[in-house]
Amino acid sequence: MGAGSSTEQRSPEQPPEGSSTPAEPEPSGGGPSAEAAPDTTADPAIAASDPATKLLQKNGQLSTINGVAEQDELSLQEGDLNGQKGALNGQGALNSQEEEEVIVTEVGQRDSEDVSKRDSDKEMATKSAVVHDITDDGQEETPEIIEQIPSSESNLEELTQPTESQANDIGFKKVFKFVGFKFTVKKDKTEKPDTVQLLTVKKDEGEGAAGAGDHKDPSLGAGEAASKESEPKQSTEKPEETLKREQSHAEISPPAESGQAVEECKEEGEEKQEKEPSKSAESPTSPVTSETGSTFKKFFTQGWAGWRKKTSFRKPKEDEVEASEKKKEQEPEKVDTEEDGKAEVASEKLTASEQAHPQEPAESAHEPRLSAEYEKVELPSEEQVSGSQGPSEEKPAPLATEVFDEKIEVHQEEVVAEVHVSTVEERTEEQKTEVEETAGSVPAEELVEMDAEPQEAEPAKELVKLKETCVSGEDPTQGADLSPDEKVLSKPPEGVVSEVEMLSSQERMKVQGSPLKKLFTSTGLKKLSGKKQKGKRGGGDEESGEHTQVPADSPDSQEEQKGESSASSPEEPEEITCLEKGLAEVQQDGEAEEGATSDGEKKREGVTPWASFKKMVTPKKRVRRPSESDKEDELDKVKSATLSSTESTASEMQEEMKGSVEEPKPEEPKRKVDTSVSWEALICVGSSKKRARRGSSSDEEGGPKAMGGDHQKADEAGKDKETGTDGILAGSQEHDPGQGSSSPEQAGSPTEGEGVSTWESFKRLVTPRKKSKSKLEEKSEDSIAGSGVEHSTPDTEPGKEESWVSIKKFIPGRRKKRPDGKQEQAPVEDAGPTGANEDDSDVPAVVPLSEYDAVEREKMEAQQAQKSAEQPEQKAATEVSKELSESQVHMMAAAVADGTRAATIIEERSPSWISASVTEPLEQVEAEAALLTEEVLEREVIAEEEPPTVTEPLPENREARGDTVVSEAELTPEAVTAAETAGPLGAEEGTEASAAEETTEMVSAVSQLTDSPDTTEEATPVQEVEGGVPDIEEQERRTQEVLQAVAEKVKEESQLPGTGGPEDVLQPVQRAEAERPEEQAEASGLKKETDVVLKVDAQEAKTEPFTQGKVVGQTTPESFEKAPQVTESIESSELVTTCQAETLAGVKSQEMVMEQAIPPDSVETPTDSETDGSTPVADFDAPGTTQKDEIVEIHEENEVASGTQSGGTEAEAVPAQKERPPAPSSFVFQEETKEQSKMEDTLEHTDKEVSVETVSILSKTEGTQEADQYADEKTKDVPFFEGLEGSIDTGITVSREKVTEVALKGEGTEEAECKKDDALELQSHAKSPPSPVEREMVVQVEREKTEAEPTHVNEEKLEHETAVTVSEEVSKQLLQTVNVPIIDGAKEVSSLEGSPPPCLGQEEAVCTKIQVQSSEASFTLTAAAEEEKVLGETANILETGETLEPAGAHLVLEEKSSEKNEDFAAHPGEDAVPTGPDCQAKSTPVIVSATTKKGLSSDLEGEKTTSLKWKSDEVDEQVACQEVKVSVAIEDLEPENGILELETKSSKLVQNIIQTAVDQFVRTEETATEMLTSELQTQAHVIKADSQDAGQETEKEGEEPQASAQDETPITSAKEESESTAVGQAHSDISKDMSEASEKTMTVEVEGSTVNDQQLEEVVLPSEEEGGGAGTKSVPEDDGHALLAERIEKSLVEPKEDEKGDDVDDPENQNSALADTDASGGLTKESPDTNGPKQKEKEDAQEVELQEGKVHSESDKAITPQAQEELQKQERESAKSELTES
């Protein structure tokens, strides 16, 4: 193409010496019409304006100098450059014509030259100022035209020059696709021949400086033309573009003759070399042009460089300039050598041009890349115009300067031109090569050629870089060329020269550093991000890549570099010094750019969770990252040696992957993770490294890891960062992997322990469970040996290890493997964990997992024989659930990190764990735990085992049972749930056993926790329920006793761990609570399904399991809270009620401890919801009220015991238990859940599987909650109390309640959609959530649905439960219950969030299943999961600032929802009173509102922190979730593009993992939290303020909630669409998260429409009143809330208690403000933790808001809600349809 156009243009270029005439013939040659017009126009332009003639003199002097002196070269290279620049949108032709047209100043400007001539006066006048302005403006204008025109031209040229163009075409078209620059792509295509000929110019320049001069003339002429024409470009560029079109079209035909043109270019090049002396004669004008060119150079070098630098490509571009300078300096030497053999080299160069055409087009592509880069970077249009014309023209302009300098000596000029051209070419090649190196570890030269194809983004970048090269490279070209030229001519402006020298030295530094950078950048970037990232990061990557490629790209540039080293030896020392620095910088920059490139690529590709993960890694574009890659590799290798051979091999493999494809490596594993491909390979590969890193970090951080499992990961990541940037990668990847599925194992295991032990523990947990027990034992022993120190170091670390293990268990691949191995082991381990629990006395407290499994299996088999065939199944599920739960518990226990954590981790982590310090106590604990477990199991079965035994080991049982008993607690509640369900469903139990087994397998694959819950439900319930109804009473007594004992012990221990332990306890408690509430919620649904009889039985059984689950599951934390609560409940002297109250209080206290404000209510409510909501509603209805008081007492006591928790628990527990009728809602939702469960699982035993899966999901959620709370706790070791008590659960409650709305509505919809799919369920959640209006309408509708869909169900169950009134009370209680269960579920879901890595897939599935199966029964979980997601979304939205609006909108909305629900629920005053599901959904969101604003702020704080920590842990899973969260986070985390990328990356995992929904939520939370924990407190404060104010205002506007919220909702819809397209599951999750973000937003929006307009007005009124008050308070309090969240969370107990007490003390707030108290009060309870009094004010303001908001909402409800309701319903329905479609 370049050859053809060059040849054809050469013949006219010979006339271009005569300016217009040559230009006209040149068009005939290069493009007769196109160039004739340019030249004709150019002549009039020249004639019209003397300044244009001056410009022509500049450009034309470039042409004269370059053209006269280099006219032969110009002819040759004009053909080449015309071809090349014809490829450059005819810039080559115009630039060549510029050069050819000595008089026609910017013939090289192709068409712009005429315009430049026309506007030469303007250009000359405004050359300095206007060049930039017009370059900006003109480029902005012209690039569009040029983009379009050169696009066709370039396409034609590409078609004409398919070989050159196609190679370039592929990459450049992609660049355009990615970069969106038509011009760049086609220009790149067009320029590719130019660049190739530019390379040819290098060679020819050796022969005839004219060739290089021509190339420089095109480049410099184009640069000058760009400079000059940039000034007239606004007016001129369009004509220029037309001219360029003509010339490009004219050149398009020449490109067809590229082959011939190359030869002709050789011949004509020689002729032009001869003619160049004529042009050299014409070059007298070059001095002026040289100065002008210098000015232009300054402008372009500085101005363009400034633009480039603006684009954050300054260094790369400067480096490019330097690289080009280097190349130029090197090439001047070459050119000097080449000049001697100019004629010969001209022919050779023509041949080289032909050969180099592919490279040259690539280089030409780099010029367009530069312009495209400009367009991308700063002045997309302007810079593209300047970049396309400007860079080409700029290059001619600077080249003109150089050419002017070169005028003095045509040969030297040619040398300069050659050097510059070569520099440009080399730089272009280097850019290409570097970009390609960045793109991949492809050889630089291969990359140069390949860059034409793959580096499509590079064309723009390299155009930008070529602009740099021309702009800043003009100086470099002069500087580099003038370095030799100064030596030779020393005529270039000294300022430019010095500038050039500086740039040259810098560039050399970076160029010389470029080989390393090549290595780093080429590692995996080419493959992954070569195209998109380059387009995105082209400026940075390619520039540094160019520098890297300068040596590698062209032997000439290397030779020149060597020669130039001599020529510029003064610069070389600097260069060397700088090069060393620059080398590191280039490497680091390359790495950073690599990361940026990969990030950009990720963003562009939107591909990967890997992109998100990589961005998390890459955001650490840190200089040390390259070195840390090495360090990490070294560490990985060193530590891999410690690993097992498989692990070592995998570690080495991953190290190699990481080393060679450092970034692609995580991406590939991530994709594997996404694909669930070879988790073990991924685990071994990625986890070994990170395990090794983390192993050392874990060894170092053994103790800290307990509390800071996630912190530890972050710390380890920090350590790794300290260790090396790869450590950063590893750290972020550890964060990511732990969270992401890709390296959760990678990140998880490393953090877990020595790495080997951790890894092997993880491996044991994941895959090896299938493996021989001896293997597991060996691994356990090895792990114990390796991690004995670590594990003796702590319980924290084992817990973390276990949490990682759990995380990894829940990872999709792991899930699959683990379900296989674990399910396989589940039967083997049927006796295992249970046996371990019962036989813990016999089994050492710290038993290797393999030994533990073997021994436990044997013992459990014996016990199974003793117990029953079903109990073994239960225990198989129990074992699986146990291990999963324990793994999660370990996660939670790792979070707990105290005695609970030690025991919890000890039991599950025994293999890894067996540390002498822990072993003996744990043996005792396990003995006790075994007794307790046996007792608990027997209590479950017999309900008559010694509760004292449970009580006796309770301290240890906290620890041991934290794991064992938590698992059993999970099992027990699940078993009790199953028993409760199975009692009535006695026949179902067998079916449930099989269905639960199937479900267990299904859930095993989906979530392993579900396995044990299913089995547990299957087996235990029969005995328990059948024979355990009296036993349940005994169990209640014993539960009370145990709870008392546990409460006492837990009080002691929680007081001891009070700060760490209680937190840790909170997490186990929250785990157990989450488990129990979820189990109870699901069991509630099941029990509701089962019957009121089961309610009584389930209540007792559930209370017992719940209590046990709590006591056992909560072990220390649960026992702590339970103990206070149980003790206080017992102190309340209501044993049965106390049991329930204890259970509720325990749950409440526990969840209060966990969530501490709303969690107590949540805990209590889950007891109500799950205990009451299901069967216990009958028992708990009376205790509900009593327990309300009890719970008030208990919570008051728990205020003392739990501290802040008590207040919220009291207020919330009282309302929750007041509104005891959650059962109807639970019934409705349960049957919906059943239906959903049936629909989703298509399970025959919907009730069974609702029980099984719901309970399983609950167990999942339990374990996940444990892990999540563990993560939350970790995340907020300090904030955990703060955020745990207030923040987490506040946010969680908010999320839950929002999710409850979502779940209620979404579950109504979900009922239909859960029938469709979990994804659709999530989508229904997402769909339902998208509009809280629709939520409310859907809640109403779905109340109607739920009462209509479940009308058969809901009415049946509402009829069961006293339809509406009961539903209202149930709604109240479900408000409370849903608040609590949702809070609990949110906790659980928060746990799911926190634990999502372990339970992510499971938990996601759990959330899905909970939402589907337990959609109604586990509605709390679904709501909780979705609330949690909403919380994450709310966190993100809060971060985005929309959460607060949904919070206030939600709060008010929910009260309005309650009022709306009042329509259904007939309780306008009570948000909880509305129809149980609706009331739950809406009342819960009311709680969510206050909580959302306050607690969510706190929770965002806490969950931010939690998310931050879990983000580290869940980076991979977060990556899995990130795509979901990308959509959501795109809405919410648009400020958090990194998170978006993470979310994008996580989309794969999201696709693979519904757990991403929770993860997504968590990570949206966490990602948002992570970014926004720092940001959020600022950003969330601001955004909360803005979001609340704006969101409230938006909500006021009602449609503006749709604006902001609907922006999110359309984004949610779009994102949900994209995510629907991307992932059905991910879409479900995205729909969930996005819909929940949308839901929150739509809650803002929909609530803005129905309730949001009601409550937007209301929330905007109150929220703006509160925006002034709660909004202001919310904003300040969100600020203060986030800040106070941590502060007050730190001081959490007292402020919380005060606030809680106040809120609890507010009866009004507790009733209508019950939702308010639950919302505001619970939030105040939570929020008090966070905000303390502020929260109260907020709550009061919110309550006022809620009340006002109800009024306003009612008004707005009537006014805006319907419009917006419809709008947002439409939005939601569109989102739903999108989600449904997806």
Curated annotation (Swiss-Prot):
GO terms for cellular component: cell cortex; cytoplasm; cytoskeleton; cytosol; focal adhesion; neuronal cell body; plasma membrane; Schaffer collateral - CA1 synapse. Residues 1541-1554 are annotated as: RII-binding. Residues 16-53, 145-154, 640-652, 986-997 have a biased composition (Low complexity). Residues 446-456 have a biased composition (Acidic residues). There is a cross-link at K1051 (Glycyl lysine isopeptide (Lys-Gly) (interchain with G-Cter in SUMO1)). GO terms for molecular function: adenylate cyclase binding; calmodulin binding; protein kinase A binding. The modification Phosphotyrosine is found at Y374. It is a lipid-anchor. GO terms for biological process: adenylate cyclase-inhibiting G protein-coupled receptor signaling pathway; cellular response to interleukin-1; cellular response to tumor necrosis factor; G protein-coupled receptor signaling pathway; hepatic stellate cell activation; modulation of chemical synaptic transmission; negative regulation of vascular permeability; positive regulation of ERK1 and ERK2 cascade. The modification Phosphoserine is found at residues 11, 19, 28, 75, 96, 154, 219, 248, 258, 280, 283, 286, 347, 371, 381, 392, 483, 505, 554, 557, 598, 612, 627, 629, 644-645, 648, 651, 696-698, 749, 761, 787, 806, 1328, 1331, 1391, 1395, 1587, 1727. Induction: Activated by lysophosphatidylcholine (lysoPC). A motif (AKAP CaM-binding 1) lies at residues 607-627. It is found in: Cytoplasm, Cell cortex; Cytoplasm, Cytoskeleton; Membrane. Residues 108-125, 226-249, 315-347, 363-379, 423-435, 458-468, 625-639, 655-674, 708-724, 792-803, 1072-1089, 1187-1198, 1231-1251, 1333-1355, 1629-1639, 1675-1699, 1734-1757, 1766-1782 have a biased composition (Basic and acidic residues). It holds the Pfam family RII_binding_1. A lipid is attached at G2 (N-myristoyl glycine). Residues 266-557 are annotated as: Involved in PKC-binding. The keyword ATP-binding does not apply. Binds to dimeric RII-alpha regulatory subunit of PKC. Antibodies against the C-terminal of gravin can be produced by patients with myasthenia gravis (MG). This is A-kinase anchor protein 12. It comes from Homo sapiens.
